[in-house]
Amino acid sequence: GAENAYILAKTPSILENNMPTIGDLTVAFWMRTTKNTSAQGLFSIPNSIKFWGNFDIFLENNNSETQAFFKVHIFNQTAKENDERWVEAKIDDIFGSEWVHLAFVYDGNTSTITVYRNGEGVFTKELPDCGKLKFNNVGASLAVGAFQFSTTPSLTSGAGAQTWAKNFPGQLDQFRLYDKVLTATEIQSIYSGKE
């Protein structure tokens, strides 16, 4: 990782076709970093006309040497137009010199998001009536290690770079995106297999 580095991953065609009505979602990756002092983008499924993406994961400042403050933003185009949801998850033992495996799982059947750390569920929150994910204005690229608006050029016409928002300077590896709910057993297998 580097302060101004990020990855733009072209949305795979199979996912690009399914992304607008993805329904369920799992994002899994390994990360290694030290305490953050600013908001740092980790992942974004962009919305090409809004400030926030369709699905964003980022670190917020928590003033802790080991506990990370993750924020997840979901912009779901359900029957309730512009259904915007926020999830705040404080997860222990993230910062330091060791690699940590994380998985963020959204289940559209239960409207629940679960966060796994090193193969174990450590946080769950229900988002009442959120339902299956439906995204609009999905861009051709996904942002890894950045907010959608902090890339050059910005992935959205809704905003440009923000002074409070930084790219992720730590390390990310084996980043995975699934259009389904991975089970606890599957996530444990990815973690224990060091995949």
Residue ranges: model-predicted function:
Residues 43-76, 131-134:
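Glycan-recognition/cleft segments
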Residues 1-25, 86-92:
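Short surface loop/edge beta-strand patches of beta-sandwich-type extracellular domains
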Residues 98-106, 115:
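Short tryptophan-centered beta-strand motifs in secreted/extracellular beta-sheet-rich domains
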